[in-house]
Structures are given as C-alpha cells and as structure tokens.
C-alpha cells in the first residue's frame, strides 16, 4: 500500500454534508485494510480563484495509506459528487502525521487570542477588586468623618 495526501474542496452550501462525506471516504479506506494517518478540516476558506462563480469552499485534508483500487474508488466518488468542486491526490513517500502548516498557524492564532482574552479578564477582575477596595475605603472614611463630626 502507498501513502497519499488528498485535499478536496466542497461547495460552501454543502458544508453540513462534510462530516458524512469524510466518514464515507475514511470508511472506504479502512474497510480495504488501509489507514487514515491525518484528517484535518480546514473549514470554509476563500479560494485563490473562483470556480463557477463560487469564491469560497470547505477544505478537507486527508493523509491515507491505501491500495490502488480504493484510490480509484475515491477518485470516482470525487468526480461524480457535485458537492466536490476540486480534488487533488498526491502520492507521498511516507505517512505524514504532524499538523499541516495551515492548522499550526490557526492553532497558534487561537492560542494567542485565548491568552489575550485571559489577560483581559484577569485585568478586568483585578480592576473590579481595586474598585471594591476603594469603595470600602471610602465608606470607612465616610463613617469615620461622621463619627468625628458627632464628637465635635
């Protein structure tokens, strides 16, 4: 069996069908004794050029190990499925299991965004604590000034 990298683009109106399509394709690979080494759903993205006046598509990346028969079956499925706008199959020398550069960049930006949100929440909670302390101090000052005015 050989290793392949498969990328296919799904029509944006058919995005809800993507999990079912991926499940069918992975089942076809696994049923024949193959393996799916990497599966990434890149989501809906802007295409480099429009296809049939469509500017966005749902991108899926799969790294699989399978035989020629299964590969031909997948190719046929891609060709006759109207929801699949484009597909690309590349033969690889070995299984690729690490994250793709696109997913790495997305995960890094998500982590940065989460850290920034956490910092903002921490700063907000710290500011609220300071305000609470200040209001307590003001109340204590008001009470002490009232006590002093009563004594006089």
Curated annotation (Swiss-Prot):
Keywords: Ribonucleoprotein, Ribosomal protein, RNA-binding, rRNA-binding
Region entry Disordered, spans: 96-152
Compositionally biased residues, Acidic residues: 125-152
GO molecular function terms attached to this record: small ribosomal subunit rRNA binding; structural constituent of ribosome
Any one Gene Ontology BP term: translation
Highest taxon above the source species: Bacteria
Leader sequence residues: none
CDD domains per UniProt: bS6
GO cellular component: cytosolic small ribosomal subunit
SUPFAM superfamilies on file: Ribosomal protein S6 (SSF54995)
Pfam families: Ribosomal_S6 (PF01250)
Gene3D superfamilies per UniProt: 3.30.70.60
InterPro entries: Ribosomal_bS6, Ribosomal_bS6_sf, Ribosomal_S6_plastid/chlpt, Transl_elong_EF1B/ribsomal_bS6
Matching HAMAP family: Ribosomal_bS6 (MF_00360)
Family classification: Belongs to the bacterial ribosomal protein bS6 family.
Cited function: Binds together with bS18 to 16S ribosomal RNA.
Protein name: Small ribosomal subunit protein bS6
Gene assigned in the entry: rpsF
């Amino acid at each position: 069996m050989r290793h392949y990298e498969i990328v296919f683009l799904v029509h944006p109106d058919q995005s809800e069908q993507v999990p079912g399509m991926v499940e069918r394709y992975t089942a076809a690979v696994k049923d024949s004794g193959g393996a799916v080494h990497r599966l990434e759903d890149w989501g809906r993205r802007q295409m480099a050029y429009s296809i049939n006046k469509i500017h966005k598509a749902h991108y899926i990346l799969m790294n699989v190990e399978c035989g020629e028969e299964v590969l031909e079956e997948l190719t046929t499925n891609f060709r006759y499925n109207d929801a699949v706008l484009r597909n690309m199959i590349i033969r690889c020398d070995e299984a690729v299991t690490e994250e793709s550069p696109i997913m790495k960049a997305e995960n890094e930006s998500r982590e940065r965004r989460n850290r920034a949100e956490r910092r903002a929440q921490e700063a907000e909670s710290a500011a609220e604590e300071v305000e609470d302390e200040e209001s307590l101090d003001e109340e204590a000052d008001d009470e002490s000034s009232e006590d002093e005015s009563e004594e006089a």
